[in-house]
């Protein structure tokens, strides 16, 4: 693998880097005599926080101007007639987000934040009855998911024994699908809910959403299946409606590039809302923004839910958040959507993998040695089982920060304005995004990583 090959691949796969604001050495406060302060960074951290689309600043300023010019009247009479009055600010996003998650427009809503949305959905979909009380998920789940699952069972008077957690097996780096299927089989009479991440935040594993959902539903329609799509939305093609997923929640500040802490979203299959009459109404966390919009401002003490996922909204959404999401979704629409980007994403991450696995420092996943100097790739090596992220675990481990291999590699990368995500104690997550990363900068980033290891390895020779 060479720089020339990287440049050749960049000619084959277009970049949309010019749509985004890229941090520079200067803006990051990094002083390196080899680079001008205006030199752009290599940003491989979109799996943590995506970069800002250039149009976002104008989109937010337009709404700030509306606030200045008309105040509360902008809810129904926006000063810019080309823009949406605030009362309906989130509605234009539905046709933009629906294709990204593979849903009908009536199955999605832009609302809340990831864990708040997950909790709201659990209130509706976790319905323990008889011995069917348990939730199946992963041991290494993002902690916020664990807190949500633990608290929902406690709200119903159960304890943590009603949580079934699958762990990564010794000698493996991620959970194999067959183990999830086996766990569903073994607990099918006791399961109320199955909920996994679409993509595992730490390892980057892309779970087989369709296969797992279908199998659980075949065992019993009483088993509800939900997904945390924080690392999947905007990263890999999804088809939630056709896959028969009951519900899903996501954030929008990673691959959807909508800004820190930005508003999230939900999917609820239309079978739960399309005939949502009083006779079949299922209680949920309700609020006035989920009520019939024609009745909302009459202030009636009667909840008449919208016949769509919008009925799960509780409060009016943040206007500034929503337009930030919209500006990013418009970029996705402009470039042809996630499916169009997937071909480049697979090629880009495979290029990264090939560079890493051809290194003298590469240690195969099957190796049981923890003392050998180098790194393992925790992520599945099969492109179909991952998104754009590769998680690299450095060894041997040292508790002392000045000796820790990962800490030292990450510091070297940062000194060269290569921005990635560290997960203590020993993992760096590299995520080349097809929207704004190139093969050339991926090649350069890996060479800098090897330089860091060369410097450290002298202590082990």
From Swiss-Prot:
Keywords: Cytoplasm, Hydrolase, Pyridine nucleotide biosynthesis, Pyridoxal phosphate
Database matches in Pfam families: KYNU_C (PF22580)
Family statement: Belongs to the kynureninase family.
Major subcellular site: cytoplasm
Protein's cellular compartments: Cytoplasm
Reactions listed under catalytic activity: L-kynurenine + H2O = anthranilate + L-alanine + H(+); 3-hydroxy-L-kynurenine + H2O = 3-hydroxyanthranilate + L-alanine + H(+)
Species: Candida albicans (strain SC5314 / ATCC MYA-2876)
Cofactor(s) named in the record: pyridoxal 5'-phosphate
Assembly notes: Homodimer.
Modification sites for N6-(pyridoxal phosphate)lysine: 254
Protein name: Kynureninase
Record-listed E.C. numbers: 3.7.1.3
């Amino acid at each position: 693998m060479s720089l020339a090959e990287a440049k050749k691949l960049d000619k084959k796969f277009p970049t949309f880097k010019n749509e985004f604001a890229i941090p520079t050495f200067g803006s990051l406060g990094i002083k390196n005599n080899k680079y001008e302060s205006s030199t752009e960074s290599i940003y491989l951290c979109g799996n943590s926080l995506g970069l800002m689309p250039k149009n976002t600043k104008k989109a937010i300023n337009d709404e700030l101007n509306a606030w200045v010019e008309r105040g509360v009247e902008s809810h129904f009479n926006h000063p810019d007639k080309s823009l949406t009055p605030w009362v309906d600010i989130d509605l234009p996003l539905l046709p933009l987000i629906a294709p990204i998650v593979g849903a009908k427009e009536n199955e999605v809503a832009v609302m809340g934040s990831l864990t708040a949305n997950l909790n709201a959905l659990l209130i509706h979909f976790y319905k323990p009855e008889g011995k069917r009380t348990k939730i199946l998920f992963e041991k290494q789940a993002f902690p916020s998911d664990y807190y949500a699952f633990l608290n929902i069972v406690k709200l119903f008077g159960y304890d943590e024994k009603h949580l079934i957690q699958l762990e990564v097996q010794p000698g493996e780096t991620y959970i194999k699908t067959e183990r999830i299927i086996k766990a569903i089989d073994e607990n099918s009479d006791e399961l109320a809910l199955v909920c996994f991440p679409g993509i595992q935040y730490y390892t980057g594993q892309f779970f087989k959403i369709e296969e797992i959902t279908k199998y659980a539903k075949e065992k019993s329609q009483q088993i509800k299946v939900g997904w945390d799509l924080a690392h999947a939305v905007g990263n890999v093609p999804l088809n939630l409606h056709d896959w028969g997923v009951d519900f899903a929640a996501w954030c929008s500040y990673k691959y959807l590039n909508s800004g820190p802490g930005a508003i999230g979203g939900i999917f609820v299959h239309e079978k739960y809302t399309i005939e949502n009459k009083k006779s079949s109404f299922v209680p949920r966390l309700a609020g006035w923004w989920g009520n019939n919009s024609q009745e909302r401002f009459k202030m009636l003490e009667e909840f008449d839910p919208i016949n769509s996922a919008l009925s799960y909204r509780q409060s009016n959404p943040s206007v500034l958040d929503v337009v930030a999401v919209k500006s990013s979704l418009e970029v996705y629409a402009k470039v042809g959507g996630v499916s169009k980007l997937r071909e480049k994403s697979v090629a880009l991450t495979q290029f990264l993998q090939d560079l890493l696995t051809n290194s003298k420092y590469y240690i195969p996943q099957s190796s049981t040695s923890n003392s050998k100097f180098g790194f393992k790739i925790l992520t599945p090596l099969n492109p179909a089982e991952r998104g754009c992220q590769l998680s690299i675990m450095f060894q041997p481990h040292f508790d002392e920060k000045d000796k820790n291999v990962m800490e030292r590699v990450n510091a070297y990368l940062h000194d060269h304005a290569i921005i990635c995500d560290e997960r203590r104690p020993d993992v760096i997550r590299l995520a080349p995004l097809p929207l704004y990363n190139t093969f050339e900068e991926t090649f350069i980033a890996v060479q800098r990583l090897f330089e860091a290891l060369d410097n450290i390895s002298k202590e082990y020779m």
